[in-house]
């Protein structure tokens, strides 16, 4: 989790030039306005016409400067039928979520320490789940209608590492021999997968 705040409010100065390791510099409260504690951004559904059939609406410190130094952030994730939030990791935060509509298969992968086990369940509207920091996880819409969930993190900037994109769309690319050895496949398979994620998409 993030460090404890040292003041009630520290509205992020996103245009500031100062370098800060944890959080952003603070705007003077006289310049912060009166809406820094409120946001309506998650009321709108995202566009799920994407390769994954999902859309993430982020509400971290970059989108909600009032969360600066408070150690929290939120996302809304919308899913088309059959849409997925592909396997990914949040390196800096634990995630807790609630399915608001539809039904999602939520999968959480333990580390080698816990036997590399997959924990999964279909989570329905009104039900919740928790994902420990740093563990790989995914969500998949198993229903016949659109679905969405709202998740919260114990960090103003939880970070995200999409596993497929990281392996096959990095810049510069991971050398193909590394991936053929690690994945135990032929070079042609790796090159095909790289072509699917070219340009970081």
From Swiss-Prot:
Native organism taxonomy: Eukaryota, Viridiplantae, Streptophyta, Embryophyta, Tracheophyta
Glycosylation sites recorded in the entry for this protein: 47
Disulfide pattern: 10-26
Binding-site list for Mn(2+): 88, 90, 95, 137
Domain Cupin type-1: 40-191
Protein name as it appears in the record: Oxalate oxidase 1
GO molecular function: identical protein binding; manganese ion binding; oxalate oxidase activity; superoxide dismutase activity
Family: Belongs to the germin family.
Provenance organism: Hordeum vulgare (Barley)
Catalytic activity annotation: oxalate + O2 + 2 H(+) = H2O2 + 2 CO2
Major site of localization recorded for this protein: secreted
